[in-house]
Amino acid sequence: LAITGDPIPTAERDEVKNVYQFNSRKLAQYIVSLAGEGREMPSPLTVFGALNLNARNFDVELRRAQEKLENGMSGFLTQPVLSAQAVENLKKTREALGSRAKILAGIMPVVSQRNAIFMENEVNGIHVDAEIIERFAGLDRAQGEELGLEVSVKAAQAAAPYADGFYLMTPFNRIALMERLIARLK
């Protein structure tokens, strides 16, 4: 997974500096070059990158995705699909890239209103629809997990026509929750 990371938080900018001479496209190009001149990556190795379905200017993100493919990436892992706009941008990506790229849509269950608000406000690249955040109000842990499963299954179903598969992100080490999600997705 060739990624360059998130922007440095404002509070840490005096101590930590951004590195601009390298980006994920150059990293992918370098990784592919390790196979040797004119050779493909040995199977089963492949280079993937990130695709932010929630980018403010998605046309720029889509152009970068095309550049990533030109520099040796085979596909993308998306940010979690938690909004109708993310699904629309996933569709737009599939239409633009066709079968040239594998796309694995991210599925991450939201488990509480606090979790949803944190993801929306503090995690770069994730957008949780306000309607989803509101639905978690007043729910206990069990109810929150059940709603999280429902939202995740609906997100996966909406993303399925445009994705080659999914990758799952486990919230708060809740393995049993993920087992239930996998069972529902089968």
Where are these regions (language model features)?
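Catalytic beta/alpha-barrel core
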Residues: 1-2, 74-84, 146, 167-170
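Active-site pocket-lining/capping segments in soluble small-molecule metabolic enzymes
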Residues: 5-7, 18-40, 50-55, 97-155, ...
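Flexible, glycine/proline-enriched loop segments at strand-loop-helix junctions
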Residues: 11-22, 74-79
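Short, well-ordered secondary-structure micro-motifs
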Residues: 12-14, 58-60, 88-89, 114-123, ...
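Short, acidic/polar
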Residues: 57-68, 148-158
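Non-catalytic positions within long, well-ordered alpha-helices that form the structural scaffold/packing
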Residues: 69-70, 95, 159-160
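C-terminal/domain-terminus segments
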Residues: 168-186
